[in-house]
Amino acid sequence: LELVDQVSGELGLSQPPSVIGSTNNQTIQLLSLAQRLGKDLVRDFEWQKLVKAYIWQTQTAVSTTGNITAGSKIITNIPSTTNLQVGNVITGTGQTPYAEILTIDSATQVTLNAPVTTSTASVSMTFAKQDYDLPSGYDRMISDTNWDRTDHWRNLGTKSSQDWQFLQGGIISIGPRERYRIYNGKFRIFQALTTVYNFSFEYVSNYWVCATGSSEGTKAEFTADTDTCVFPDDLMMAGLKFYFLKAKKLDYGIELGEFTRALSYNKAQDVPVPSMSLAPVGMNQLVGPWSVQDGNWPSV
């Protein structure tokens, strides 16, 4: 890694012939600190090279049959559980509202997280998917970017645990728009949809390391000497020198100042910002209630 070579040279240390796989304690420490620095920078700011758009689709619900017994959480005699998943929400005769699959026991049996209220054989039921995978390299979602592109409105979230219990337990909690939360590393929606919808959101990726020949992040840590990263060289070098001196319990006051300045400069210059007026004037609205005539429909 050129980063380790450059920092070693500036600190008056011996420059290693290779970094990945080295058994030299100093080289191992510099690599470990560089890995930590990169991960810290990912969490520190929404760097434009780490912002990604994710577009995905919900899945069609699975309609099937099974045997249920009052007071039991087990459903038997399901023709096939192949397309079912833990967390799927069930609807049908005798089912508790928002009950979901707790375990898939066999090719014909599942266990729910709530008992049914009636006994029926070969009763119809529907399983809808509420948990969806987050994209590879996902670190965190960017606020207010989650949209339903099918119905053309913003999804509501993220919801807290308190909000979620209200949605599932409140008397009136259902609305026309989807609610969501990040739950157990999944994207969970309410209510679980039974047909295909197109959803989208933007997120910050934790893939800050670029593989050889690539200018985009494809992994979350250095794994080869030819790897580079999405962050500017001056920022990485200033940060690694500061991290190294701090780890060695040496004076790092000057290096901390250099790193702080580099971080501030690069944040400010990462994306363009609009000019700010000292005397802003609101723009006129071209379309409003005054654009609609009082009567005489249809207009000619």
Locations of regions flagged by a protein language model:
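Glycine-enriched, solvent-exposed interface loops adjoining structured elements
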Residues: 1-73, 82-103, 107-300
